[in-house]
């Protein structure tokens, strides 16, 4: 089944935010770079997705045209088969991604990127609902600790576990880097 790798929001905008933590980022980059290397060596197309949103001001690292809307430092270089700029959580909303996937005969997508429970999860659910098979590579996603409305802190690991729990066997196959690449063609 023809596959594409979706590299979602792996951009320099995130380290500019107060919630950014380097904890987990190095492991994330190791996994995501292994996905990139594996995809390139197998001829799997890679789609680069950037998130832009909010006011067009110098203080917004996600603003269209911000110098921070560029690949995250440490991300392996790759030639994108398609680059899209999204303004919503799903990479399939308001972008040419769905059309490109159909035109290129893509039936499975591998999801990796930042943030696990936001744009990666939302794109996974949306892609599944639209009929694509999805491999969600949790260790090639990154998120950060969050505080619930009740004041409880959830660790990034807890958030990832929750995301994987709600996606598995419903919206996606959970896969390691090696498993996702082995399934890809």
Write out the residue ranges for each language-model feature.
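Acidic/histidine-rich helix-loop elements
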Residues: 15-25, 151-153
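Active-site-adjacent betaalpha module
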Residues: 1-4, 31-42, 60-185
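N-terminal nucleotide-binding beta1-loop-alpha1 segment
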Residues: 5-10
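A short acidic, helix-capping loop that chelates divalent metal ions and anchors anionic groups
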Residues: 14-18, 55-58, 145-147
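Von Willebrand factor
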Residues: 39-54
